């Protein structure tokens, strides 16, 4: 299983050319081996918020995009273990709560996070692919 950061899920749906070769390879391998590709439930919130504020332009209504995501991805819930770990990440980790929850999800699940976010990758708190 792999976990996609919010922007990676959006790019995969809307503009796959923005993905790195390594990210595409990891996603293709997961699909070929019938492994789960997951996103955090907070990514849905982030996407809905971005669409509502006009910061991302979707080809389809956000509800339809979420229907596509439900078919394509495993949506990972925010559990008490994830919430606790997100709150306990070191202060050197980026402070954005959504980033912390997404990284903690990868850590609790024991899976790599596909992200272009250099702050998360530099923190080395979780295994990342980019």
Segments predicted by a language model, with ranges:
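Short, well-structured N-terminal submotif of metal-dependent ribonuclease cores
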Residues: 1-39, 53-67, 109, 119, ...
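Alpha-helix capping/helix-boundary segments
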Residues: 8, 43, 82, 102, ...
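Active-site neighborhoods of divalent-metal-dependent phosphate/nucleic-acid chemistry enzymes
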Residues: 59, 70-116
């Amino acid at each position: 299983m792999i976990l996609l950061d919010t922007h990676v899920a959006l790019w995969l749906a809307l503009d796959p050319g923005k993905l790195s070769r390594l990210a595409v390879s990891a996603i293709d391998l997961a699909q070929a081996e019938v492994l789960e590709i997951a996103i955090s439930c907070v990514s849905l919130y982030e996407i809905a918020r971005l669409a509502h504020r006009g910061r991302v332009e979707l080809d389809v209504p956000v509800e339809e995009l979420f229907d596509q995501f439900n078919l394509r991805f495993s949506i990972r819930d925010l559990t008490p273990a994830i919430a606790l770990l997100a709150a306990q990440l070191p202060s050197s980790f980026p402070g954005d709560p959504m980033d912390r929850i997404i990284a903690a999800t990868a850590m609790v699940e024991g899976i790599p996070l596909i992200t272009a976010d250099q702050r998360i990758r530099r923190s080395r708190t979780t295994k990342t692919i980019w």
